[in-house]
Swiss-Prot record:
Descriptive protein name: Ubiquitin domain-containing protein 7SL RNA2
Location in the cell: Nucleus
Organism field: Arabidopsis thaliana (Mouse-ear cress)
Gene giving rise to this polypeptide: 7SL2
Keyword Transmembrane carried by entry: no
Record GO cellular component, one term: nucleus
């Protein structure tokens, strides 16, 4: 994803941010491009400093602007009292994200980053019928149980999209569905145009990479064709972090996961 960096002086530059990069890696790219040391950079989002070891997906940097503050050089001749006063002023500026205008703020260079291009903004759209009820589909279980493919021929009805309540087999009392069930079903849309949608049952706590492994096994069995090129698993136009769980990626029951070829 290409991002333009605009400064208060009117100059600008551009950097490319990849899907799985951490905040520290973004700072290193700025240092390599502009010569600004990583130790001088502080990235803010919604008034909070970003942690170097977290990924850009953690902060939804795909859709939000960043504020880059460059710390001024320290004065070796400054007294302890002056240092403490400067620290207090700096804390106030950090709290207000440098919005207030003061003489001290002129020592800082602020850089605003905004998203200008998303490689997935032009993804093909699918109809509601394609997503909810393909005529021929397969159900695969990913997790502790033996994987099994089941062919179904029923056409899903859009009127049946409401979630049902669970009933205890030994009791007529209804129980509400949990917010994050241990197992749930996702719909996988193959990269190649196909009339079938693959239904896969996954564990909420399993990493997304388990789904990729299962798709490779299905290809080996001749049940689907994966892209020849490297591809990403994408849900709601956001790439999934495969080393994290489905729950961490906020994948819910009934969500659609697409296979998008790497650009």
């Amino acid at each position: 994803m290409n991002v333009d960096i605009d400064t208060e002086t009117g100059s600008s530059f551009s950097i490319t941010i990849d899907f799985g990069e951490t905040v520290l890696q973004i700072k290193e790219k700025i240092e390599k491009s502009q010569g600004i040391p990583v130790s001088k950079q502080i990235l803010y989002l919604d008034g909070k400093a970003l942690e170097d070891d977290l990924h850009k997906i953690d902060y939804m940097i795909l859709f939000e602007s960043l504020l880059l503050r460059i710390s001024p050089d320290a004065d070796p001749n400054q007294s302890n009292e002056q240092t403490e006063q400067s620290k207090q002023i700096d804390d106030k500026k950090q709290e207000f994200c440098g919005i207030q205008d003061s003489s001290e703020s002129k020592k800082l260079t602020r850089v605003m980053a905004r998203r200008v291009h998303n490689v997935y903004s032009s993804l093909p759209a699918y109809s509601l019928d394609e997503l909810l009820g393909p005529k021929y589909s397969a159900t695969v279980t990913v997790g502790g149980r033996t994987n099994q493919v089941v062919q179904t021929t029923e056409q899903a009805s859009t009127s049946g999209t409401a979630k049902e309540v669970l009933r205890d087999s030994d009791s007529p009392v209804e129980k509400k569905i949990k917010t994050n069930p241990m197992k749930f079903t996702v719909h996988v849309k193959p990269y190649q145009e196909d009339t079938k949608m693959i239904q896969v049952e996954v564990n909420a706590d399993d990493n997304v990479e388990e789904l990729r492994k299962e798709l490779v096994k299905m290809q080996e069995r001749g049940e689907l064709n994966l892209p020849h090129e490297a591809f990403h698993l994408v849900s709601s136009e956001l790439p999934l972090i495969e080393t994290k769980s489905f729950k961490w990626n906020r994948v819910a029951d009934g969500d659609t996961i697409e296979l998008i070829r790497e650009k």
